[in-house]
From Swiss-Prot:
Its main location: cytoplasm. Belongs to the class-II aminoacyl-tRNA synthetase family. This is Histidine--tRNA ligase. It is found in: Cytoplasm. GO terms for biological process: histidyl-tRNA aminoacylation. The gene is hisS. Keywords: Aminoacyl-tRNA synthetase, ATP-binding, Cytoplasm, Ligase, Nucleotide-binding, Protein biosynthesis. Its EC number is 6.1.1.21. InterPro entries: aa-tRNA-synth_II (IPR006195), aa-tRNA-synth_II/BPL/LPL (IPR045864), Anticodon-bd (IPR004154), Anticodon-bd_dom_sf (IPR036621), His-tRNA-ligase (IPR015807), HisRS-like_core (IPR041715), HisRS/HisZ (IPR004516). Coiled coil: none annotated.
Length: 424
């Protein structure tokens, strides 16, 4: 029988890696708590229609990368390729943004895309999403940008990333610009790449996002979106840039930045880095004021961003910003198998009294000699011996594993006070 292996592009997170994830997740939660964002937990499986109507049928994600299947009732379902669509569906279904209500939410979890696996980009990947609903003014734009900047700053990597941003203007601005772009592209139809040709009919703006070199040459003299943006949108964008200047954020206006998802409008942005080889985005977001209404909800402002956590961990690791793994025990208990119940109850009492103490033991309960060998390998500070002789004397033995000190006995009624000093 062949050996079962993990699916290509999926990863197990082993114990020595989990501590890095826990460090990152605790930092994220701490920062978002300061801004009063509430965590939500969303299903990984949604109706396929949700992503067709939000992300866009012509987007690479929906047309090439989703994991779709038909369930036993004949309904088409999709493993979520991103989090915003599901979060908006939840907001609509639970009437969280009706009648002027506001929500500030965040979530974290696995997303799924069928793309070529490479370092920092996998078919199952973890993503942080931060979303705000019901806010129309510029203040929420500035808060979202500040939160994303503070995440990098708190992690010690703000010097490793640069913010790129653009404004897509209003819906009417984009319609006017789309007409001008299509008119410009007419003579160059044959020179466009296959994906861009498909986008001509459904979402021409996405052509600006093409990675094809020949298409980018065609676009070199194309009309600029900034020339079609109304005065209010332009003023708002200029005020955003002025705020970033005052905050001291390293940023650059990128007029070709339109984002890879169809639902964006107004402000769009990416945080990029060159520390992982070719320039790569580690965070991306923007406004999507029409998405709630397009999915059947009441019209409400919306803005958010997402961070790929694997890529962020790679960046932290490359810059030496992850904590050194510390899986050492404080105390290794060595137990007499003949006094098992009493010994285990004693150890459990220590755990209850000193929850910060990291305790280990050999649950195979081999000989004292084999238990001492495991205690030495554990790198614990001390070994506490609970043997028959010790218990008769209402005491435990203490052997110092990291210090050149004589073994000693500690009375049972003083054990907690003694171990409390070990935990400090």
């Amino acid at each position: 029988m062949s050996k079962l292996t993990i699916i290509r592009g999926f990863n197990d997170i082993l114990p020595q890696e989990s501590c890095k994830w826990q460090f990152l997740e605790s930092k994220i939660k701490s920062i978002l708590d300061k801004y009063n964002y509430d965590e939500v937990r969303l299903p990984v499986l949604e109706k396929s229609e949700l992503f067709h109507r939000s992300v866009g049928e012509t987007s690479d994600i929906v047309s090439k990368e989703t994991y779709d299947f038909v369930d036993r009732s004949g309904e088409s379902l999709t493993l979520r390729p991103e989090g915003t669509a599901g979060c908006v569906r939840m907001v609509i279904e639970n009437s969280l943004a009706n009648r002027g209500q506001t929500q500030k939410l965040w979530y974290s979890g696995p997303m799924f895309r069928y793309e070529r696996p490479q370092k920092g980009r996998y078919r199952q990947f973890y993503q942080l999403g931060v979303e705000a609903y019901g806010y129309d003014n510029i203040a929420i734009d500035l808060e979202i940008l500040t939160i994303s900047w503070n995440l990098f700053r708190e992690l010690g990597i703000s010097e490793c990333v640069k913010l790129e941003l653009n404004s897509l203007g209003s819906s009417s601005n984009r319609q006017e610009y789309t007409k001008a772009l299509l008119e410009y592209l007419k003579p160059y139809h044959a020179q466009l790449d296959e994906d861009s040709i498909k986008r001509l009919d459904k979402n021409p703006l996405r052509i600006l996002d093409s990675k094809n070199e020949q298409t980018q040459q065609v676009l070199a003299n194309a009309p600029k979106l900034i020339d079609f943006i109304d005065e209010d949108s332009l003023t708002r964008f200029e005020q955003t840039c002025e705020y970033l200047d005052n905050l001291g954020v390293n940023y650059q206006v990128n007029q070709k930045l339109v984002r890879g998802l169809d639902y964006y409008s107004g402000l769009v942005f990416e945080w990029v880095t060159d520390r992982l080889g070719a320039q790569a985005a580690v965070c991306a977001g923007g406004r999507y004021d029409n998405l709630i209404e397009s999915l059947g909800g009441q019209k409400a402002g919306a803005i958010g961003f997402a961070i790929g956590l694997e890529r962020l961990l790679l960046l932290l690791e490359s810059e030496g910003k992850l904590p050194i793994e510390d899986d050492k025990s404080d105390v290794f208990f060595i137990l007499d198998n003949n006094q098992l119940h009493r010994s285990l109850l004693l150890v459990e009492n220590v755990r209850q009294e000193l929850p910060a103490l990291k305790i280990d033991m050999d649950l195979k309960f081999g000989s004292f000699k084999s238990q001492f060998k495991k205690a030495d390998k554990s790198d614990a500070k001390i070994a506490v011996i609970i043997g028959q002789d010790e218990l008769l004397q209402q005491a435990v033995g203490v052997k110092y594993l990291q210090q050149d000190k004589q073994q000693e006995q500690i009375p049972l009624n003083k054990l907690i006070n003694f171990l409390e000093k070990i935990a400090i």
